[in-house]
UniProtKB/Swiss-Prot annotation:
Oligomeric form and interacting partners: Interacts with PRLR.
Glycosylation positions in this chain: 59
Pfam families: Hormone_1 (PF00103)
CDD domains with a match to the protein in the record: prolactin_like
Gene that specifies this protein: PRL
Covalent S-S links between cysteines: 32-39, 86-202, 219-227
GO BP of this protein: cell surface receptor signaling pathway; female pregnancy; lactation; mammary gland development; positive regulation of lactation; positive regulation of receptor signaling pathway via JAK-STAT; response to nutrient levels
GO MF annotations, alphabetized: hormone activity; prolactin receptor binding
Protein name: Prolactin
Lineage per the UniProt record: Eukaryota, Metazoa, Chordata, Craniata, Vertebrata
Amino acid sequence: MNIKGSPWKGSLLLLLVSNLLLCQNVAPLPICPGGAARCQVTLRDLFDRAVVLSHYIHNLSSEMFSEFDKRYTHGRGFITRAINSCHTSSLPTPEDKEQAQQMNQKDFLSLIVSILRSWNEPLYHLVTEVRGMEEAPEAILSKAVEIEEQTKRLLEGMELIVSQVHPETKENEIYPVWTGLPSLQMADEESRLSAYYNLLHCLRRDSHKIDNYLKLLKCRIIHNNNC
């Protein structure tokens, strides 16, 4: 197929470069380099960049969870306590692809934005608390810092997408509130590590959901479900 001069060329090159950066664990390009107020990026490119960025965040979240699991939780059985205890569990998220495909497009976009907003505070405190740990593992801290920064960028990108797809939509500030800071500051090491494990487990879970949801939405909105 000759892509010279076709509208696919820019998107294809962007995805190729972004995939190379992901393989090298380098942050993807900004969703809108000029900032939201002066954004001239097309809807197709906004989705391309959001999908690449969400996948990058999920990869980092998975790596950070694995690092923490290996270093701190061997044989402690934290996983049994982490099930269904995420602060975003109250959100009505689709459980499989079929449910996701049946979800109203506007509600789907709003759901992704709500999940991203609900992670602003826990990610900020995660970075702050890990920095304060004795002998804070650099591999975990650096990933936490990067995830916090890139999640803000992804949220900005999603708000731009919503403004293009549904310009009549008013900003929705309703999202689940995280109340787990006291648990991260407990004096008892077992309880504190369990709280960290739960938070990282939930982050990995939610970043995976967003990654999948964005791919489905891109297929629906940009390619008219022809994927």
